[in-house]
Amino acid sequence: RYYYASRGLGDVYKRQTLRIREGDPLEIFTDREGEIILKKYSPIGELSQFAGEYAESLAQTTGHLVLITDCDHVVTASGTGKKEYEGKPISKQLEDAISERKNFLASRNDAEFVKVTLDDAGEFGQQALSTIICEGDAIGAVILYEKDEKSRMTETESKLAIAAAGFLGKQMEQ
């Protein structure tokens, strides 16, 4: 899966403005009008159909909203509320949690709780998050989200997120 950034000649943009991190693989093209097109490679994008099926199965089993992200966007979502998240850019908080390779279970009032997307309404009260690691690199996250604060997430949800992240990371290595 690729993400495109196209800018006219003469426009100067910082690497951070385009959400390009040091070491990110890019392809550079020019079109007929002379515009530069950057294609950013997303390793999880290769597994988007498989990741979607995995998320759907996990959502049906747990009853939670399940999100699978790369380091830039929500790649797939399954469960109640998925339309609000699928394809949206992730928040700086989540980007930091991924780069720090965090795995946690948190409630909305906990310091570790992160907004998933830039425009996350904050209607979910609990989350279990696990970073996807592939060949030693943090490439995304698996997040289980729960709206109802009365039905507490447990270590089971945390372990399910960790197992899903581990499995997806191993699939990427093949």
Briefly describe each language-model feature range.
Residues 38-41, 78-81, 117, 147-149:
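Short hinge/gating elements
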